[in-house]
Amino acid sequence: MRRIAVIGSGIAGLMTAHDLLKHGYDVTLYSDRSPEDWLNKSRPTGIAARFESSLAYERELGLAHWDKDFPPIEGVYLIFSMQPTIPFIILAGRLSENGAAIDVRLQSYRWMNDLVERGGKLRIENIDIPRLDTISAENDLTIVAAGKAEIANLFERNEARSVYTKPQRKLAMVVVKNTGKFEKIPYNPVKFNFIGDHGEAFWIPYYHKSVGMTWNLLFEAKADGKMDKFTNAKSGDEVLVIAKNVIKELFPWDYDWFKNAELADENGWLTGALTPIVRNPVGKLPSGRIVTGVGDTLTTLDPIAGQGANNVYRMAKNLVQNIVKHGNGTFDAAWMSNTFEEYYEKSGKATIDFTNLLLEPITDAGRQLLIAQYGSNGVSCSGQQVIANAFSDNFADPTFLTSYFTDSAKVRAFISEKTGRHWLPHTAGSLLSVVRDQVRQKIGMTPGAGYW
């Protein structure tokens, strides 16, 4: 039986370890914290939103312990504003299949215990480079799934694929209970607020480790904009107060929903920034031995597109499939590189491109797509609704529509196909509706599109 070590007990490490165990490998998982530490002492690692392909992978491995409990993510409700307090474009899109966001602290606690019960080995210790070298000597393959920890620097930055050299947003996240409900929206959405020069904010239905149904709020502030107020926050209470003020100032349509919100738990918050990066998949140790990586260790994404967890699932599944296919072969540098390239071509590039597109000013093609769907309501069968649903489904599978966002010809053909009309008169009619709703707001009325 081939021995494989996995370093890290987040989603990437645990999904990889469980899949390997299912395929009969001798698996040892190394974690810097115990299951109880994950559950009771840790911060959330992010929004942890995942879509149907990821949830199906959990079911395949017998890890879907919360399928009947979590609040479903049924679609996207997006408000795009050029300036604070004034909606410009509204999109109400439904997902083809529901997604979910589940507290990683609860998952890691349960999945680590599951691993031991199923015959895997668990070691609780901090792993540095010398210790990693020793572990590598004891195993046929060692996989680093340590997220953005210092050990990830063992893997060199891929300059050609890493677009950014510094963080693109200042981030703040808080998990809250005691919110209102979006009763007028006829489905349970991820609610997006995009606002010109200031940043983006997302409200995600979230299954919390002890409270159950909560909301996970993510703020993506552009430096020096009106959302950029979280940097000096020292506690979840401070983040919550700032969040209420930001929502009241920038997104007043959501203030009544949020004004009575409370922290779900004292550790349920984060602030910081990260630099998106793609790393090479071969890490060379001082002894000359090599290890590979999975998840954020190799591809760190800004959370703006909600692709972090989904990217991890795709990469882990591809990695295990290639391990199994490799049989008794040597896990050399060529195998590691080829395995990563297969993931990158199948889904990684599209996922990274989609995420980076949302960090940049909207493209002409993207603008045409948003205008063409204007009037979507989440329930109709109109051409606008079909386009809005397609936009939403790209979060579930970025290979679906990402290439269209930089190709106006493809977008125009897509609009014509989905609406049954030539793209030009359809888009012109939608643009007229946008202008009409701007006039309505100037005279004190709400937009005709959307739910208010």
Regions flagged by a language model, labelled:
Residues 7-9, 21-42:
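Glycine-rich FAD pyrophosphate-binding loop
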Residues 59-60, 67-156:
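Conserved N-terminal helical subregion
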